[in-house]
């Protein structure tokens, strides 16, 4: 959806984390690991920062100026794993716009993945700040993020 070839950059790191989580997914208590503290964080961070979520907006501040992950935790879940994250985002109008403005906020998705089916089973999304106010009436962000995440998961699983 975003046209980014980020999977080759992060596939080994995510595959390793996936194996780690699958091995502990039968544990009753949820265990989590932060991706921010892994050796591959710089590759994952670079890939995340290339995501152009604001470009999915039909008008207004449809240029991504900042998309920075401040939390990404991988947690064990009964059928696979959960990804809990927080991303600071700034969307702005183009430099050529007659009226220029930007909106800032945080996107906090909580995604559960069924490893056997290689699919996202749930996506809870909270968007705060000015970005949240701007996007609340559009209803676009959750489908865009879910589609993008499922597309990346399909590539990792070899379905793409």
UniProtKB/Swiss-Prot annotation:
Residues 1-29 form the signal peptide. Keywords: Plasmid, Signal. It comes from the Bacteria. This is Uncharacterized protein y4fE. It comes from Sinorhizobium fredii (strain NBRC 101917 / NGR234). The lineage of its organism: Bacteria, Pseudomonadati, Pseudomonadota, Alphaproteobacteria, Hyphomicrobiales.
């Amino acid at each position: 959806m975003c046209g980014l070839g980020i999977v080759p950059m992060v596939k080994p790191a995510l595959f390793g984390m996936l194996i780690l989580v699958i091995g502990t997914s039968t544990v009753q208590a949820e265990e989590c690991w932060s991706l921010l503290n892994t050796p591959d964080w710089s590759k994952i961070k670079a890939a995340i920062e290339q995501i152009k979520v604001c470009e999915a907006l039909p008008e207004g501040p449809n240029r991504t100026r900042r998309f920075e992950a401040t939390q990404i935790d991988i947690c064990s879940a009964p059928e696979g794993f959960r990804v809990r994250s927080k991303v600071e985002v700034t969307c702005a109008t183009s430099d050529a716009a007659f009226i220029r403005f930007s909106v800032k906020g945080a996107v906090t998705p909580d995604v559960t993945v069924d490893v056997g089916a290689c699919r996202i089973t749930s996506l809870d999304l909270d968007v705060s700040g000015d970005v949240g106010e701007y996007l609340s009436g559009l209803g676009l962000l959750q489908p865009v993020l879910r589609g993008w995440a499922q597309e990346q998961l399909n590539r990792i699983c070899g379905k793409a």
